[in-house]
From Swiss-Prot:
Lineage: Eukaryota, Metazoa, Chordata, Craniata, Vertebrata
Positions bearing carbohydrate: N37, N355
Gene3D superfamilies noted in UniProt: Ammonium transporter AmtB like domains
Tissue distribution: Erythrocytes.
Protein name: Ammonium transporter Rh type A
Membrane topology classification: Multi-pass membrane protein
Molecular-function GO terms, alphabetical: ammonium channel activity; ankyrin binding; carbon dioxide transmembrane transporter activity; leak channel activity; methylammonium transmembrane transporter activity
Record PTM: Glycosylated.
Record topological domains on the Extracellular side: 24-51, 101-113, 164-167, 230-239, 292-295, 354-362
Length: 409
């Protein structure tokens, strides 16, 4: 850790600086016009029109995701700190990879949409991070960030440019992809020594409150996430409204099913922290489609139910039978709701809510899951090499391995 991590971080940042010097320029007014398909003259005002949405997404990435993962009682520093590290590297690398793909290897101009998409690429890695939380080193996370974004960007390009599928809120390309990529990595990195659990793999009263802060930030800003890159006008308005009501319906369903499946009808904080967000994930694919508010509420309700049931029944099954230990339960918050979103998109297209093809929507869902699993397995094999400073079983879920921590915790 003393030399491997600093060397890796410095080399990667030098590489980012060199790549930005070779490929990235400021965006010009003419480029803005072409990117947004606007024929009349405009100015850089479009940058500042989208900047509030970008800031909302930015808060979700750095505050929402970071604090959502602070539920482990002795892993708060790593949850927030490594989240910051991964996101900072991810947005730089995502800018480069996505830009090169779009420009076919030529220089490209950077604008507000590039910055939003860069944050989206970082979000994908943060979702996967949740599956291996507490069991990996900072060096391993840097490597995973570099590799995952390459797979993510190519799949996103395939979905949007080749299949021409609709996935404005990225239920398939970000949420399902990130979840199944993380599960594949977790499967390769499975530790038999942790099959009976670990004393630090639990929450405390204060850590659950911190995690709930992350939930609230994500919940409030999710309409911005799903509408940030939508076509201005009716589609962007629909994306905001549909997400707003899907999230609201999801909360009631999540609370109801949490009480239903828990002993004596008590609410489980794990369900409330996570399943209440599933509606935002699931409505993403068809957020900008004319599915009507009641349609978005149906999607949100289904997502909340599926998420709670996943936490209650599927997570233990994955650990004991499939040897996939999902620390944060990303399969239930992002994976299953992402699949629900993909299926909802197919149904919406079949009902005439979009001009895209049902076959291409299905292909996009299959591609996202397939690429994620293959990429995750390959990445997991690389991360398993014994030179990245991964913690021992005994030291998992403990900040003191990689951080200076106070004596009193």
């Amino acid at each position: 850790m003393r030399f491997t991590f600093p060397l890796m971080a410095i080399v990667l940042e030098i590489a980012m600086i060199v790549l930005f010097g070779l490929f990235v320029e400021y965006e010009t007014d003419q480029t803005v016009l072409e990117q947004l398909n606007i024929t009349k003259p405009t100015d850089m005002g479009i940058f500042f029109e989208l900047y509030p949405l970008f800031q909302d997404v930015h808060v979700m990435i750095f505050v929402g995701f970071g604090f959502l993962m602070t539920f482990l009682k002795k892993y708060g520093f790593s949850s927030v700190g490594i989240n910051l590290l991964v996101a900072a590297l991810g947005l730089q690398w995502g800018t480069i990879v996505q830009g090169i793909l779009q420009s076919q290897g030529q220089k490209f101009n950077i604008g507000i949409k590039n910055m939003i998409n860069a944050d989206f690429s970082a979000a994908t890695v943060l979702i996967s991070f949740g599956a291996v939380l507490g069991k990996t080193s900072p060096t391993q996370m840097l490597i995973m960030t570099i590799l995952e974004i390459v797979f993510f960007a190519h799949n996103e390009y395939l979905v949007s440019e080749i299949f021409k599928a609709s996935d404005i809120g990225a239920s398939m390309t970000i949420h399902a992809f990130g979840a199944y990529f993380g599960l594949a990595v977790a499967g390769i990195l499975y530790r038999s020594g942790l099959r009976k659990g670990h004393e630090n793999e639990e929450s405390a009263y204060y850590s659950d409150l911190f995690a709930m802060i992350g939930t609230l930030f994500l919940w409030m800003f999710w309409p911005s996430f799903n509408s940030a890159i939508a076509e201005p006008g009716d589609k962007q308005c629909r994306a905001i409204v549909n997400t707003y009501f899907s999230l609201a319906a999801c909360v009631l369903t999540a609370f109801a099913f949490s009480s239903l499946v828990e002993h004596r009808g008590k609410l489980n904080m794990v369900h409330i922290q996570n399943a209440t967000l599933a509606g935002g994930v699931a409505v993403g694919t068809c957020a900008d489609m004319a599915i009507h508010p009641f349609g978005s509420m149906i999607i949100g309700s289904i997502a909340g139910m599926v998420s709670v049931l996943g936490y209650k029944f599927l997570t233990p099954l994955f650990t004991t039978k499939l040897r996939i230990h999902d620390t944060c339960g990303v399969h239930n918050l992002h994976g299953l709701p992402g699949v629900v979103g993909g299926l909802a998109g197919i149904v919406a297209v079949a009902m005439g809510a979009s001009n895209t093809s049902m076959a291409m929507q299905a292909a996009a869902l299959g591609s996202s899951i397939g690429t994620a699993v293959v990429g995750g397995l390959m990445t997991g094999l690389i991360l398993k090499l014994p030179l990245w400073g991964q913690p021992s079983d005994q030291n998992c879920y403990d900040d003191s391995v990689y951080w200076k921590v106070p004596k009193t915790r």
